[in-house]
């Protein structure tokens, strides 16, 4: 219900919201007051009406409880979101009321952050947009103010790829008890947390497979977290390439305890391996081989790129990598220079075959004659060079 009454030289519109509370606005002209009241009634009828008081809540006052109730997030993801909020979102936008967080305000914040930290700006923008979508769903604001085109795109540099020979050299450069970590990361395309979570029970040498059932990660606070992979796609069984089986068999016999829950990737004394120890050994190995540009995760990237080069389909790459969407697997469909050259040669071969099939017998005879080196050329002195 809405009414419009004269108040001195102005017109006051009164609108009763669905909660029974009255909201008033004063306008210099009667028509403006009537239009406002009609607009409020229309929003209410369409289910789009929002209590103006909701928009007074600040970004920080909404974002903090939002993150606290996200029980579906992993510990590492919560830490990342907390870092982005405290370091890049709340210092600039935390005190801004939700209703005042307009697209222009967001665009100005993003532009400033992107000049300093492009990749971080993309991550922070995606998080802010996610929070604002929640604010829209909670009817705190009418629309998402995050409207920067491409704001959430990271444009990260293409990650380096190790060759098969380089992976072998990197494995040899690792301490003996960690050599198999390099082989599994590359040939079985395991993530670091999956490597550290691998147990004896997860390895089936008889059938040549390993199961990704547990991951181990370290929080920013230094606590080790052991849990199941965060997605259904991440829980998978991977076929072990036959070239890795002998090394893995020897590793299990020499370094891994008989208990089914014994860790496969172990420390020097046979205990659980700490992530920082693996990182330190990896840093030394890549320096020894001359590939300091490679991260440990790039071994997985390299292995998936090899798989794509053999002709693996997107579905096959998704299953092996534990990806839940085709978008993640598509990045491995890019061709290396060697693969691209092989494709070009194959295409040229198709063209040659088509040409040979189409020429006449007389042309074919001419080609055979012209392909023989002439006697004069065979005995001609070589041209001098300058």
Region locations from a protein language model:
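Short, surface-exposed polybasic/aromatic micro-patch for ligand or macromolecular engagement
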Residues: 2-57, 231
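N-terminal core-binding DNA-recognition domain of tyrosine site-specific recombinases/integrases
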Residues: 3, 17, 23-29, 55-56, ...
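Basic, Lys/Arg- and aromatic-enriched nucleic-acid-binding interface segment
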Residues: 7, 118-126, 137-200, 205-206, ...
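Catalytic-site neighborhood detector that most strongly recognizes the C-terminal catalytic loop/helix
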Residues: 30, 153, 203, 216, ...
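Conserved hydrophobic residue
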Residues: 49-50, 141, 313
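Short, basic (Lys/Arg/His-rich) helix/loop patches that form interaction surfaces
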Residues: 118, 169-179, 188, 238, ...
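C-terminal secondary-structure termini that scaffold catalytic or DNA-interacting sites
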Residues: 172, 207, 216-237, 242-244, ...
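Short, polar N-cap/turn motifs at the start of nucleic acid-interacting alpha helices
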Residues: 202-209, 293, 312-331, 356, ...
